[in-house]
């Protein structure tokens, strides 16, 4: 009986490993890769002041904001046009080009 359980477990292990998603470096599942000059949390002095000036309300003070962001092409990541500041993936890049909301830092 034990040998059957061991055999089934051993044969099922590769199925579990194959079903696990793996994100590659530079992948974004929240939005396009952006290069931001700086990042702040919504609860920081700079973040809350900027959100107040723009009249933007966010759900949490822990939301990461990208400031002065520009898009990075995936093709350019390895060829010298990489981001020297803060590479991030952001959910909402439509706040006038000044601020991006819901950013997640990534490694290029």
Curated annotation (Swiss-Prot):
Q: Which residues are glycosylated?
A: 92
Give the intrachain disulfide bonds. 28-89, 35-83, 36-69, 90-103
Q: Which terms are listed as keywords in the entry?
A: Cell wall, Disulfide bond, Glycoprotein, Secreted, Signal
Its annotated compartments are: Secreted; Secreted, Cell wall
Q: Output the InterPro entries linked to this UniProt entry.
A: Hydrophobin
Q: Which GO terms describe its molecular function?
A: structural constituent of cell wall
Tissue distribution: Highky expressed in hyphae cultured in liquid medium.
Task performed by this protein: Aerial growth, conidiation, and dispersal of filamentous fungi in the environment rely upon a capability of their secreting small amphipathic proteins called hydrophobins (HPBs) with low sequence identity. Class I can self-assemble into an outermost layer of rodlet bundles on aerial cell surfaces, conferring cellular hydrophobicity that supports fungal growth, development and dispersal; whereas Class II form highly ordered films at water-air interfaces through intermolecular interactions but contribute nothing to the rodlet structure.
Subunit structure of this entry?
Answer: Self-assembles to form functional amyloid fibrils called rodlets with a diameter of 15-30 nm. Self-assembly into fibrillar rodlets occurs spontaneously at hydrophobic:hydrophilic interfaces and the rodlets further associate laterally to form amphipathic monolayers.
According to UniProt, the name of this protein is: Class I hydrophobin hgfII
Naturally occurring in which organism (per UniProt): Grifola frondosa
Native organism taxonomy: Eukaryota, Fungi, Dikarya, Basidiomycota, Agaricomycotina
């Amino acid at each position: 009986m034990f040998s059957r359980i061991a055999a089934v477990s051993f044969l099922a292990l590769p199925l579990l490993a194959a079903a696990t998603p793996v994100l590659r470096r530079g992948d974004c599942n929240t939005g396009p890769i952006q290069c931001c000059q700086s990042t702040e949390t919504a609860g920081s002095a700079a973040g809350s002041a900027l959100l107040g000036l723009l009249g933007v309300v966010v759900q949490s003070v822990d939301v990461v904001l990208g400031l002065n962001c520009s898009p990075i092409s995936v093709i350019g990541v390895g060829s010298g046009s990489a981001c020297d500041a803060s590479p991030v993936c952001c959910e909402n890049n439509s706040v006038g080009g000044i601020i991006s909301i819901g950013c997640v830092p990534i490694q290029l």
